[in-house]
Amino acid sequence: MLQACKMEGFPLVAPPSDELVTYESELYQRQTHDYYSLIGGDGDSHSDHYWDFSTHHVHSEFESFPENHFTELQSVQPPQLQQLYRHMELEQMHVLDTPMAPPHASLSHQVSYMPRVCFPYPPLSPAHQQSSDEEEGERQSPPLEVSDGEADGLEPGPGLLHGETGSKKKIRLYQFLLDLLRSGDMKDSIWWVDKDKGTFQFSSKHKEALAHRWGIQKGNRKKMTYQKMARALRNYGKTGEVKKVKKKLTYQFSGEVLGRGGLAERRLPPH
């Protein structure tokens, strides 16, 4: 068979002999035995031999250097690494900050464009703007404060002339006081000084009771004070319905208010 393989031209590799296999196994067993003999031996002897070898080589090479020299070399390495990391972080931050310029530029362009959005809207007329300001003032003002925009501009009906509580229609403060003066209600708190001129005066003792009555008329949850009611009367001085007289706690209605009040009084049914 061997000759036939040679004649056909195929390379021939002889199979391993039994002696070679036996030799390798014996070598492996011998090396394994030597390895375990080293492990199972006395560990102290090997440890002593190791430290003797290390001590011999270290002191022979570096015995000329002082001891503190090695400590300084070990303490210098970490700061050098930290400086390297910080330098790398600064470079990364510089690279990241560079592309942020275009978004800021576009943002400033958007802000500059914002006022143009309001231009197409038509401006409010003076009358409409004044009405919006009055409504906004009522929403922002405290609930107890009497504002000048509390009236709806309608002529008060007969049910409002005597300050009836719970009415759905609004009544202004000057009309409320005029109704009290003409009806004689709460005459201990307010009275005429000169009816023809429209001058009236509050009582220094009972003015708070009248203010409380006005708070109930408005539907306020908290108690109305004379100070807030007098503030509303001073606001009427700007529009002309009521003006302050130099005398203490004394005010005067305008002729227009007295005329409207006389017309409403004539509309009342006879008792």
Swiss-Prot record:
The modification Phosphoserine is found at S141, S147. Residues 154-164 have a biased composition (Low complexity). It is found in: Nucleus. Changing S45A: No effect on transcriptional activation of CSF1R or FCER1A promoter. Residues 171-254 bind DNA. Transcriptional activity at macrophage-specific genes is inhibited by interaction with GFI1, which results in the inhibition of SPI1-induced macrophage differentiation of myeloid progenitor cells, but not that of the granulocyte lineage. The keyword NAD does not apply. GO terms for molecular function: chromatin binding; cis-regulatory region sequence-specific DNA binding; DNA binding; DNA-binding transcription activator activity; DNA-binding transcription activator activity, RNA polymerase II-specific; DNA-binding transcription factor activity; DNA-binding transcription factor activity, RNA polymerase II-specific; DNA-binding transcription factor binding. PROSITE patterns: ETS_DOMAIN_1, ETS_DOMAIN_2, ETS_DOMAIN_3. Pfam families: Ets (PF00178). Residues 124-164 are annotated as: Disordered. GO terms for biological process: anatomical structure regression; apoptotic process involved in blood vessel morphogenesis; cell differentiation; cellular response to ethanol; defense response to tumor cell; endothelial to hematopoietic transition; erythrocyte differentiation; follicular B cell differentiation. Pioneer transcription factor, which controls hematopoietic cell fate by decompacting stem cell heterochromatin and allowing other transcription factors to enter otherwise inaccessible genomic sites. Once in open chromatin, can directly control gene expression by binding genetic regulatory elements and can also more broadly influence transcription by recruiting transcription factors, such as interferon regulatory factors (IRFs), to otherwise inaccessible genomic regions. Transcriptionally activates genes important for myeloid and lymphoid lineages, such as CSF1R or FCER1A. Belongs to the ETS family. Binds DNA as a monomer. Can form homomers. Directly interacts with CEBPD/NF-IL6-beta; this interaction does not affect DNA-binding properties of each partner. Interacts with NONO/p54(nrb). Interacts with RUNX1/AML1. Interacts with GFI1; the interaction represses SPI1 transcriptional activity, hence blocks SPI1-induced macrophage differentiation of myeloid progenitor cells. Interacts with CEBPE. Interacts with IRF4/Pip and IRF8. Interacts with JUN. Interacts with RB1. Interacts with TBP. This is Transcription factor PU.1.
